[in-house]
């Protein structure tokens, strides 16, 4: 599972997921899976989508993961009263804005890439679209 090795602070404020995305172009591979909606991806969701893609292409070609879960999400245990401090870190998320390229792929035919990204998109909680590299 993806998570930072070290962080400056253990816990962070909730914050807001506003603004425009960085990394909106396919830069490493030929095909990409781009976010259309806004949301957050957990490390488990990122890994599940990666596994689905890898199995679909039968381990040929190359896959790049363009998102990293660097925000800790805390939760308090069940049936615990309010107060007594912030809960423990339970999982890590990556905040996603519209236009962000989530995954890239190279070395496979376009039909296979579309199929693999379709399987991966089914694992993700945000709406996505298939994109190809634009040559200037």
Curated annotation (Swiss-Prot):
GO terms for biological process: translation. Pfam families: Ribosomal_L16. SUPFAM superfamilies: Ribosomal protein L16p/L10e. InterPro entries: Ribosomal_uL16 (IPR047873), Ribosomal_uL16_bact-type (IPR000114), Ribosomal_uL16_CS (IPR020798), Ribosomal_uL16_dom (IPR016180), Ribosomal_uL16_sf (IPR036920). Gene3D superfamilies: Ribosomal protein L10e/L16. GO terms for cellular component: cytosolic large ribosomal subunit. Keywords: Ribonucleoprotein, Ribosomal protein, RNA-binding, rRNA-binding, tRNA-binding. CDD domains: Ribosomal_L16_L10e. Signal peptide: none annotated. GO terms for molecular function: rRNA binding; structural constituent of ribosome; tRNA binding. HAMAP family: Ribosomal_uL16. Binds 23S rRNA and is also seen to make contacts with the A and possibly P site tRNAs. Belongs to the universal ribosomal protein uL16 family. Part of the 50S ribosomal subunit. This is Large ribosomal subunit protein uL16. The lineage of its organism: Bacteria, Pseudomonadati, Pseudomonadota, Gammaproteobacteria, Enterobacterales.
């Amino acid at each position: 599972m993806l998570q930072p090795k070290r962080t400056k602070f253990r816990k962070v404020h909730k914050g807001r997921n506003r603004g425009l995305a960085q990394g909106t172009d396919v830069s490493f591979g030929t095909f990409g899976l781009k976010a259309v909606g806004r949301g957050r991806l957990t490390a488990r969701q990122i890994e599940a989508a990666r596994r689905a893609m890898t199995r679909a292409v039968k381990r040929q070609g190359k896959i790049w993961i363009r998102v990293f879960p660097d925000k800790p999400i805390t939760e308090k245990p069940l049936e615990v009263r309010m107060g007594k401090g912030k809960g423990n870190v339970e999982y890590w998320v990556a905040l996603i804005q519209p236009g962000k390229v989530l995954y890239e792929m190279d070395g496979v035919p376009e039909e296979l890439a579309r199929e693999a990204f379709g399987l991966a998109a089914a694992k993700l909680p945000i709406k996505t679209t298939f994109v190809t590299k634009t040559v200037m």
